[in-house]
Regions:
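Metalloprotease/metallohydrolase-associated module, dominated by Zn2+-dependent proteases
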Residues: 1-63, 79-117
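Active-site recognition of the HExxH zinc-binding catalytic motif
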Residues: 66-78
Length: 117
C-alpha cells in the first residue's frame, strides 16, 4: 500500500493511546522520496518535530506499525526523558526490547524487511 500522511497520523494517534498513554505530543507528518532512511524523526526547524516515511516502499500494516513505533520511541525519549537522543543507544534498546517481548512489535528492526514497489 502507498503510505499517506493521513495513515501515519491515524496510526500515531492510535499507538500513542495504546502504548504511550497519550504522553507524546502531536507532530507533523510528511513523506519523502528517498529510500534511505525508511522513515525519520526530523528535528525542528520551525519549532515542531515531524515524522516522515519514504514513498518508495510497499507498506503494509505490520511495517507501518513497527516503523512508526520505532520513531515514537525516539520521540518518547526526547519528550519524556528530556534527552535529545536520536541514536540507538541503551535507553532506545531497552524500550525496543520491551515492545518486542511485551507486544511482539519489532521496533528494533531485527526481523523487518522493506519491499519496494
Amino acid at each position: 500500500m502507498e503510505i499517506t500522511t493521513r495513515i501515519i497520523k491515524e496510526r500515531f494517534i492510535e499507538y500513542n493511546e495504546r502504548y504511550f498513554n497519550n504522553q507524546l505530543p502531536m507532530v507533523d507528518f510528511r513523506r519523502h522520496r528517498t529510500s534511505c532512511p525508511v522513515a525519520r524523526l526530523n528535528t525542528p526547524n520551525n519549532g515542531h518535530l515531524s515524522i516522515s516515511f519514504s514513498t518508495v516502499y510497499n507498506w503494509n500494516d505490520k511495517l507501518i506499525r513497527d516503523t512508526l513505533i520505532h520513531k515514537m520511541i525516539h520521540l518518547y525519549l526526547v519528550v519524556n526523558k528530556k534527552e535529545w537522543i536520536f541514536d540507538h543507544g541503551i535507553p532506545f534498546f531497552l524500550m525496543g526490547l520491551k515492545f518486542l517481548f511485551k507486544y511482539h512489535i519489532d521496533a528494533l528492526g531485527w526481523f523487518t524487511r522493506y519491499p519496494r514497489f
